Amino acid sequence: MKLLIQGNNITVTEAIHDYVEEKVERAVKHFQNLTTKVDVHLSVARNARITNKHKAEVTVYANGTVIRAQEGSENLYASIDLVADKIARQLRKYKERIQDKQHGNVKTSEIVEDKPVEENLIGDRAPELPSEVLRMKYFAMPPMAIEDALEQLQLVDHDFYMFRNKDTDEINVIYIRNHGGYGVIQPHQAS
C-alpha cells in the first residue's frame, strides 16, 4: 500500500508523519488486499473565525473505488483520530457490500423511489451561483449501474455523485434528498 501525506498551511513533521502512518495503517490493516493507495491531506485554516481549524482528509483507493472521509477539530491529532475511525468504518461497510453482492443483488426500484419531478424547481427565486468558476476537476467516469453509483456516493462522503449510467450511457447524478432517501437526475430531451 502506498501512503502519501501532504500538508496545507502546516509542515508535516516526522512526529506528525509517524502518527498519521500509525493511525491510517491501523485503520486499513484488515483491508490490505483491497487497498492500493492512501492519500492523506492535513490542513490548518488561518481564519480566526473558523472553529475547527485542523482538518484531516483521507482518500483510499480500493480496487478502482474511491473511499473518502474528512474530519475537523481544534486539534490536529484529534482530527487524525476521528478521520482514521471514520475511514475504518467506511472500509468495513465497503467490504460488507462486496460480500453482500456475492450473495445477491438489490433491484434499482428498491433503492430509488420513482417520483415525478416538478417543472419549476426554484420557483420565483433567482439562482445563487458564484460569479466565476473557482476550480475544475477531471476524472474518469466508467459506466456503472445506479446501485454502484449509490455505493460510491456513500463512500465518498458527499451530497451527490455524478456517473455515466451503463444502461443509457448518459451522465446521471445521484444525490441525498433533504427529507431522506436518494434521488437520481437524468437528462431529458426537450420537446
Curated annotation (Swiss-Prot):
Keyword annotations of the record: Cytoplasm, Translation regulation
Cellular localisation: Cytoplasm
Pfam families: Ribosom_S30AE_C, Ribosomal_S30AE
GO BP terms, alphabetized: negative regulation of translational elongation
Coiled-coil features, chain-numbered ranges: none
Molecular function in Gene Ontology: ribosomal small subunit binding
Taxonomic superkingdom: Bacteria
A single Gene Ontology CC term: cytosolic small ribosomal subunit
Description of how the protein assembles with itself and partners: Interacts with 100S ribosomes.
Role description: Required for dimerization of active 70S ribosomes into 100S ribosomes in stationary phase; 100S ribosomes are translationally inactive and sometimes present during exponential growth.
Family: Belongs to the HPF/YfiA ribosome-associated protein family. Long HPF subfamily.
Protein name, as recorded: Ribosome hibernation promotion factor
Organism: Synechocystis sp. (strain ATCC 27184 / PCC 6803 / Kazusa)
Lineage, uppermost ranks: Bacteria, Bacillati, Cyanobacteriota, Cyanophyceae, Synechococcales
